[in-house]
Amino acid sequence: MAEIVTWVMVSYFLSINLIYLLLMALSARALVSNGHFREMEELPDAFSLLSPPISILVPAFNESRTIVATVESLLQLSYAEFEVVVINDGSKDNMLEVLQTRFALVPYPEAYRIQIPTQTVRAIYRSTLYPNLRVIDKENGGKADSLNAGINASRYPLFCGVDADSILQRDSLQKVVKPFLRSPEMVAT
C-alpha cells in the first residue's frame, strides 16, 4: 500500500512539473513571437538617460548648401544628452553666415583647451535657439585638423565624427553607444 501511495505522489508531482514546463515553453514562444523581447536600441527614450553623453563633431569646408539640413537633422536625434559641434574649416563660401543666420549664433567666450595641436581657432559661437549647438570657426587645416579642434572643444567623454552632408536616423546615437555600454573599457568602434 505504501508503494502505491509513493508512486501516485511521484506521478502527481512529475505530471504537475511537466505541465508547468510545457506552460513556460508556450509562454516563452508567445513572448518571442509577439516581440516582447527587444534589443537595447528598441527600448524607450527614458532608458537613454543612462547612456553617456556624446559630442557630435561635424567638420565642414565650403558646405553652405548642405550644412543647414545636416545640423537640423542632427538636432532632431533621439538621445538624452548630446551636443553638436560644427567646425568651419576656413570655408571660402558663406557657410558661417548661413549658420549664423539660421541658428542665431552669437560669439561665445569659452575656455578652449588645446590638448591636440590645431590651426588657429578664430572664434567659437553658440546658438541662442539650440543650447546644444556650437560652431567653431578656424583656419583651414583639413578634416583631421578640424576633428582635432572639435575634440579640444567637446564637453563630453564620447565623440562621433560625421561628414557635413550626413543625415542620421533618429536612433543612430543609441546604436553607436551600445558597444560602450556593453564594454566600458572600449575606447573606439
Report the location of each language-model feature:
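N-terminal membrane-anchoring/stem segments of glycan-assembly enzymes
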Residues: 1-48
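Glycine-rich, basic loop-to-helix element that forms the pyrophosphate-binding segment
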Residues: 42, 70, 115-154, 174-175
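Cell-envelope/extracellular polymer assembly enzymes that use nucleotide-activated donors
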Residues: 52-55, 83
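Short, acidic, metal-binding catalytic loop of nucleotide-sugar glycosyltransferases
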Residues: 72-81, 101-109
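A conserved acidic beta->alpha catalytic loop
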Residues: 88-108
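Short aromatic/hydrophobic "clamp" motif used to bind/position activated sugar donors
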Residues: 159
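The conserved acidic donor/metal-binding loop of glycosyltransferases
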Residues: 163-167
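Conserved donor NDP-sugar-binding/catalytic core segment of glycosyltransferases
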Residues: 170-189
